[in-house]
Amino acid sequence: MTNPSTKNTGVSSGEQLASDASPASPPSPRPPGAHLSRRTVVTATGASALAAGLTGASVAPATALSPAVAPLTAPAAAPPGTDPTAYTTVARAIAVYDEHDRPLVPTYLKAVENGLPARRGRATKRVLVVGAGPAGLLAADLLNRAGHDVVVIEANGNRVGGRIKTFRKGGHEEGEQPFADPGQYAEAGAMRLPGSHPLLMALIKKLGLELQEFYLVDVAVDDPKKQANRAWIHVNGVHMRRADYEKNPAKINDTFGVTGPNRTRTAAAILAQALEPAHRLIRGKEGTALVKGWAKVLKKYGHWSMYRYLTEVARLDTRTIDLIGTIQNLTSRLHLSFTHSFLSSALIDPKTTFWEIKGGTALLADALYKPVKGKVRLDRRAVRIERRAGKVRVHTVSEDSQTGKGGVTEVFEGDEAIITVPFSGLRHVTFEPPLSYGKRRAITELHYDAATKVLLEFSQRWWEFTEAQWKEALNSIEDKLYDKYRAGAVDDGAYLGAHESVKKLGVTLPDELKKSFAAFRPVAGGDPDAAHVRGGGNVSDNANRFMYFEHAHPMEGCDGGIVLASYSWSDDALKWDSFADDERYLRALAGVQAVFGRRCEVFFTNKCKTQSWMRDHYAYGEASVLLPGQHTELFPDVPTSEGPLHFAGDHTSIKPAWIEGALESAVRAALTVHTG
């Protein structure tokens, strides 16, 4: 199956994102002395794909507030004191090359598929793995199969997987039923898996997990091979199908005040053209030439924010940047590193096929956990790591011991350790003796960003309805109710959860909730036409920002489905994080109604879930999304070993927020321990 060919719906993070030739990721962020602000202040993916990049783009045209001049191609030099070797180091990390500019992916693939190489005549080691996310679990499995004595130490008391987390019933964590329909599940974390990530694809195949296509772009309900492009763009009071926007961009662009040639160009096309100066430095290159190309990108733009690049290189005015930020999901990260958004934008591409694991991404965590389950110690949070007399000691506490009301403390000893805890979490771990200055600085300063999801359950997949199906469903509740909604004549919350399919799930919504919801509902108005789509993402400038339909493929035995009502990052996410979980759901439903119409409320079950990764005290944020300059100032010290201490996790790769980055780091660390 191939992804429908159409414009992309946004620039990603997470996932935790590029050609088949090499891995890629984005996958979900102050120069010295600079004021850290939204507009003055992007960490990467596989480079070969980006070298292929976007083609056919030309110099950015003049805009309302900028002259018709070519983009600048020679920004100011990097700040004094920047280590010149850092550019090459990071360039190789982007390309996943060794010090001789040879690809590392083939070696990593062999390890994933066949295990670590034989170690003739060398003693086995006792290895402590701190953290049971995908990096920790894979590293532990590889070392365990190679004959080493492995212990995995995990702070969470009931599950493994890190930011691979599925709201589901059962699983290794024995989760309670999260939704009214016992067959439903939804992703709190990683949800879309790029086919261009070779280690992940190989691992999934090896583990025998079933994939189905994740429709980043919506497809026809009756023919999933046919693109629909009927997803909504709802900004500045304009309601428009994406296909219509591509035919007539001016209708939305005018609302931002965009003039000149860009008035009639889509936000995606404007962004692609804006990134062309950077793409020219890497396009068509490989080996040492590719490394040199990436080093040039980093020297020219690595100390810049995305906003600075768009204004000073692409010469876009603020109105056009506002357009791009809103439609392409860049607004909340304009102040972060240009590098991150540059790489991310090239990965979220119509030519990239995305997949999801049938049954939930947590099935991957289950499969990684199974062979090392007896080696994993849950409910053991590392608080102190010592190196003494040739040994590593990890001091841990149970979660309840942190309240001062008892609990358990335990010390684990080994020859070496692989530490996969996010650096934001290591800020609260004591090292004795102290780590190197570069490592300590990275732990202190590495920027972690926020990401928040709000997921709502509905008893029917109303987004797939035709108008005829809407009419039948609504009139089954009350005669001519369909006409009332279409005319905007329903001005209270009386019909919240009113459809019989909600009651069949054992749900009856209280009148108090309906009265409360009336205050959140959008102002009465005629409902828009039926969405009639499967999968895809919708854009809004309301607090929800981006909306996706979970599990585009119908689930056997389930009539309803889950809507990712809000998927937001950075500042957008923090505005949701201020609310308690239960306070988010009616607000998110109102945001969905503003885009799709109020009638969807009749299928609302009020069985909802939400995940804030910044508030998660195991994750400490969505991912390391770096600030300008941090790739060359901090990253070279992130993955390096400190004696018997080795570091892994997606933050130690140039694929933060993506499982592929975690897997790359796991193999790297396991090989270091095994062959050292």
PLM features per residue range, with description:
Residues 419-436:
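Flavin (primarily FAD) binding-site architecture
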Residues 439-466:
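Central beta-strand plus flanking loop segment that forms part of the substrate or channel wall
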